[in-house]
């Protein structure tokens, strides 16, 4: 659903965030709009793969910094691995990402960074990002980093190694899309 088409009816603006990142909707509104557009509401999909056994955490854990900045704007995103919690925390320009309702840091078990072709399409800097063709990726789990490829399968971006899907660690996954993997710099972490 395109927020430009449905702004004010399907989407509403909240005052606790700055535009344009303050547009929200609900399941009921999306369902209503999908019915109006004649979209299928049910579809068979294969489940994502998840690890079923306890994977061993790395002896040395790795953190990653992703530079989304431009020559005029700084935007550094960092993920730091916490060995005790077995999860990553995220910060943006030094500010820890927290859950708006609980105030607690958002903790993720998988960080997936994918390289996808970006093309600027207008003078405002909007981008057309190729999420169909696949490419190279980096998958962070248990403090480890795995060089992967990625594929788009039925609208989902999945990690692939040697032609096979790689399983995610059960929990939360954060996918970062960058024009070049050089935007990601990996460092050995202390592991809290």
Where are these regions (language model features)?
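A surface/extracellular/periplasmic glyco- and lipid-processing/surface-interacting theme
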Residues: 1-192
